[in-house]
Each structure stands twice: as C-alpha cells, then as structure tokens.
A protein has these predicted regions:
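Conserved short alpha-helical segments that host acidic/polar catalytic motifs at enzyme active sites
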Residues: 1-147
Length: 147
C-alpha cells in the first residue's frame, strides 16, 4: 500500500515531508519521493529514490512551505527512479502522487500521445498529470479535475 503525505505550513516543507512519510514505512514500499515548490525558481524541486526515504540525501535548502511525498508499491511500470512518484506533467507545472490504479490508463495515454504528449515513465500516475494539463488548456482547474 502506498503512503501519501501533503504539507502546507510555516515550517520547512522538505524536512516535514521526509519525517512524516517515514511514519508510513511500516506499510512497505519499493520507492519513494518528495516534491516542493521552490519559490526561488518558481518550479518544483523533486527528489526520488529506490527504497526507503532515508536514501534521499543531499537535499537542497529550499525555503518552501508546501509539498507532497509518496511511498510506492509498483503496479504499473518497473521499480526505478523514473517511475517513482511524484510525477510531473509534460509542461512541469503539475506534480502529482496517487494511490490506486487507473484502469483505463492505456486508452487515456494513447489519447494524450495522439495529442502530442510524450511520457517519461511507465506509470498511470503520469497519465493523470498530463490529462489535467490537457484539460487546463480549455477549462479552469475545477472543471479540468472533474473531467
């Protein structure tokens, strides 16, 4: 079973995410990762690893107060850093983690490929981030998430 932790607060998000996701280690997992918004670059700072979250070393000092972390049991794709979560959308503006299986992810992935999307991972999660990006071209965030 996956573990997911989100953080919004006044303290350093990276350290909070890393310490809190460790509390879910008892569930077991094969890879892990975390992501925060780097206000200095206005982009995501992501670190991933195979195995425990403790294997993530040399975290950059990022003065961020928001982020997500994830521990993964592989259901789609091999166990590697590329398939570890968080997954980014093609334009790198959406970072997502998820627990579950998108049953029709292959159909959705094919639809997105036909619309010019390229994929880095073998995960169904990357399909979600790109599908949201696709719908944001036409709709607001609320409507895009509904679709």
């Amino acid at each position: 079973m996956c573990g997911i932790v989100g953080y919004i607060g006044k303290n350093e998000a990276l350290l909070n995410l890393k310490s809190k996701i460790k509390l879910l280690e008892y569930r077991g997992y094969d890879s892990s990762g975390l992501c925060v918004i780097d206000p200095g670059t206005n982009s995501f700072y992501i670190k991933k690893t195979i195995g425990t979250i403790d294997k993530i070393k040399n975290l950059k000092k990022v003065d961020s107060s928001v982020g997500i972390s994830h521990t993964r049991w592989a259901t789609h794709g091999k166990i590697n850093k590329t398939n570890a979560h968080p997954q980014l959308s093609q334009n790198s503006k959406i970072s997502i983690v998820h627990n579950g299986i998108v049953e029709n992810y292959q159909d959705l992935k094919l639809f997105l490929i036909k619309n010019g999307y390229k994929f880095n991972s073998e995960t169904d999660t990357e399909v979600i981030s790109n599908l949201i990006e696709f719908f944001l071209k036409k709709y607001d965030i609320k409507e895009s998430l509904k679709r």
